[in-house]
Amino acid sequence: MIIAVTGTPGVGKTTVSKLLAEKLGYEYVSLRDYAIEKGIGEMKGDELEVEVDELTYNFERDFKGKNVVVDGHLSHFLNADLVVVLRAHPRLIGERLTERGYSREKVGENVEAELVDVILVEALEENENVIEVDTTGKTPEEVVNEILELIEKGVKKRVGVVDWSEVYDEVIPYLRL
């Protein structure tokens, strides 16, 4: 089973993915590291720009039929059995990305993406089996337990659990206005 864990930068994908893989006994794959290792895409500053079709082709060739948890904000474009879209309060995203040294423009871009569900919409356009999990105020263990519970119950689709439309005023300082 291929489980893709995706979401806006700063939601906790890597931490949750590694823990989920450990609890399931699956291999953990960082999509970014995989792309670099395979020579897919090119670095532009600190960012890796990849051709999504080439990435998905190579990933499917190398991992089809294997049990993996793959982490990356493009992982929802893969042919996965389940896509987990992690969400976090946009203010929290802004704080985390600012701490990581992201430019004001990049922080604003990602806060806005979280605010208007960009990754969730993309995931739903690409996949049937999508579950959305709000990580706000939860430990990585709590998030992983929620995901495992949904998997054990056979839940293949759960969306609409997050609505940030009421928090717009809180995140204005992070937006590119």
UniProtKB/Swiss-Prot annotation:
It comes from Thermococcus gammatolerans (strain DSM 15229 / JCM 11827 / EJ3). NCBIfam families: PRK03839.1. It comes from the Archaea. Its EC number is 2.7.4.3. It catalyses: AMP + ATP = 2 ADP; ATP + H2O = ADP + phosphate + H(+). Interacts with uS11. Not a structural component of 40S pre-ribosomes, but transiently interacts with them by binding to uS11. InterPro entries: Adenyl_kinase_AK6, P-loop_NTPase. Pfam families: AAA_18. Belongs to the adenylate kinase family. AK6 subfamily. GO terms for molecular function: adenylate kinase activity; ATP binding; ATP hydrolysis activity. The lineage of its organism: Archaea, Methanobacteriati, Methanobacteriota, Thermococci, Thermococcales. ATP binds at G10, G12, K13, T14, T15, R100, K138. One of its GO terms (biological process) is rRNA processing. Residues 30-50 are annotated as: NMP. The keyword Thylakoid does not apply. This is Putative adenylate kinase. Residues 99-109 are annotated as: LID. Keywords: ATP-binding, Kinase, Nucleotide-binding, Ribosome biogenesis, rRNA processing, Transferase. Broad-specificity nucleoside monophosphate (NMP) kinase that catalyzes the reversible transfer of the terminal phosphate group between nucleoside triphosphates and monophosphates. Also has ATPase activity. Involved in the late maturation steps of the 30S ribosomal particles, specifically 16S rRNA maturation. While NMP activity is not required for ribosome maturation, ATPase activity is. Associates transiently with small ribosomal subunit protein uS11. ATP hydrolysis breaks the interaction with uS11. Coiled coil: none annotated.
